[in-house]
């Protein structure tokens, strides 16, 4: 049974949970190559910069964490299942109630258009998932996350496993040893996400 204590301990040691939609179990992942975002070199795309400049979306933090994780837990287009199991949702809702899990949301005309969620520990933020209901909303939410992390002087933005979308946003892969070095340094910091 997944619980908050085990999840936090896992993050501190470079692991993260992932549900298997085939068997319903939650497994601990610790990939040899880790996707991270270098915060000091991040640059939003022109489209995202324009959307932010024009205030197309109302950006909020932790306004509706429950809705964000519920949207993230839905299967993606062209997929019938998701790695975000009910067990994972329950633990992250508890982490949010403890002030450790956070969401960044984009609203358009009062409706949730996109967002993301993750966990903040020390100077590390572990991005878990993102979704969009309107084009580019998750990218704008991600840009807002990066700006918040820079403002609070975070060192590490962990994206876990590389995929084309993360690479488009600017993620790079580092080996496990480098990841653990960066994680240890980030965890030494006493930083609040907000």
Swiss-Prot record:
One of its GO terms (biological process) is protein catabolic process. The lineage of its organism: Bacteria, Pseudomonadati, Chlorobiota, Chlorobiia, Chlorobiales. It comes from the Bacteria. Coiled coil: none annotated. The keyword Transcription regulation does not apply. Its EC number is 2.3.2.6. The gene is aat. Disulfide bonds: none annotated. This is Leucyl/phenylalanyl-tRNA--protein transferase. It is an enzyme of class 2 (transferase). The keyword DNA damage does not apply. One of its GO terms (molecular function) is leucyl-tRNA--protein transferase activity. It comes from Prosthecochloris aestuarii (strain DSM 271 / SK 413). Belongs to the L/F-transferase family. One of its GO terms (cellular component) is cytoplasm.
